[in-house]
Amino acid sequence: MSKPATTLDGLQDGSVELQKRLSAKRDAEGELKHEEDRKLRKEGKTQTPVTNQEGDVLNPYIPRFMSSAPWYAKAGDDDPSASSLDHLKKDKTDSKKEEWYARGQDRSSLERPKKFRKGACENCGAMTHKKKDCMERPRKVGAKYKADNLQADDVISNPHMSWDSKRDRWNGYDAEDFKRVIDEHNMTEELQKKLHGDAPAETDAEKAAAVEEAIRKSTRTLRLREDTAVYLKDLNSETVYNPGSRTFRTADEGYIDKDGMFVRHTTGEGKEMEELTRIAEAESALGNQIHLHANPTAAAIAAKRIKEEAEKAKDAEKRALEEKYGKQDHVRVRPKEYTSVVTAKKPTVIRAKNAQGIAVSKYEEDVFPGNHTSVWGSYYDKETAKWGYACCHCLIKNGYCVGEKGKKKKGAMDTV
């Protein structure tokens, strides 16, 4: 095996240290040439114009720290004394669409080797990979021992990419791939036209009109100004309107707290815990050292003691009232006969003048004017869509009742 070439005090060729030393040497040589050119310009003698790789003449008055490229940006075959601004320009060798990785390229069209080469894959005979990385079917007798049907080398692309192109998420994207999606959509539209006939396509104006119609329909579902709110329909004092669920709740179901929210009554252990919390808060407000969370046992004992004291005070008050007025068993209830005045001949209840009963309706009930035996509104005529009396089918509210004659006359008119 041949040893790597060494230069400059035994440094290997291609090492970073060697490149740095060569760059320093080139800079020194370039500096000497730059001094010679400067002396020639002072003496008024002509000098050879400096050109770049593209043949453009460079400005000789460009500072050296700008025109000289760093050692890591210089190519091996460049003139070390040449000054150029190419290293400051945008890299034109960046990978483009045609310089991308080979996709789906078949090796069958490439030239195959005729004999096994040293260092090639022992399975297929390609030089670009080893046996452990081979993607071909494992052969019973490898290509190393039987040079039959050797495979060509893999197509390895090495596109030159800059720092930005390596981190570009769309780098390598081929817009032609989206054409397949467009073709699928076009095929679907053609099939729909065949199924639904050759109907004209909907224009943009028609689509906009359809959207406006949908918006107009949705606006009709809005609440009218004449609508009455739910909490105004039932003004019963025994019910409470819950704004959260928009329903009415009775006092048996819960109550409204200080924040205006509906709180449902608890049962079982939850009710006991709520009562215990209420007692603990009340005692804490009075200055007693009762804390439900810090010492729940002491709080429970104190709550039990407070309940017993309240029951004892209630029993003492009840006994005092019984001693003063007697027990409930000895209290005589006022007879029902004394609640109203009844005459012997015609038993009618005489009430006070200011007594008002529960009004069922604002209209007068059981009033039969005009010799009618039924009330107004007991009959409905479907043909004329009017209300009337059921006794004579009269549709005039102030009309006089004619009995069965009115029904017969109405029936004869319907038959005609």
From Swiss-Prot:
Keywords: Metal-binding, mRNA processing, mRNA splicing, Nucleus, Spliceosome, Zinc, Zinc-finger
Top-level taxonomic group: Eukaryota
Subcellular location: Nucleus
Protein name from the UniProt record: Pre-mRNA-splicing factor SLU7
ZnF endpoints (CCHC-type): 119-136
Main location as per UniProt: nucleus
MF term (GO), any: zinc ion binding
Region (Disordered): 1-114
Transmembrane segments: none
Record's compositionally biased regions (Basic and acidic residues): 18-45, 86-113
Matching Pfam families: Slu7 (PF11708)
Description of how the protein assembles with itself and partners: Associated with the spliceosome.
UniProt lineage: Eukaryota, Fungi, Dikarya, Ascomycota, Saccharomycotina
Physiological role: Involved in pre-mRNA splicing.
Family: Belongs to the SLU7 family.
Biological process (GO), any one: RNA splicing
InterPro entries: Slu7_dom, Splicing_factor_SLU7
GO cellular component: spliceosomal complex
Nucleus in keyword set: yes
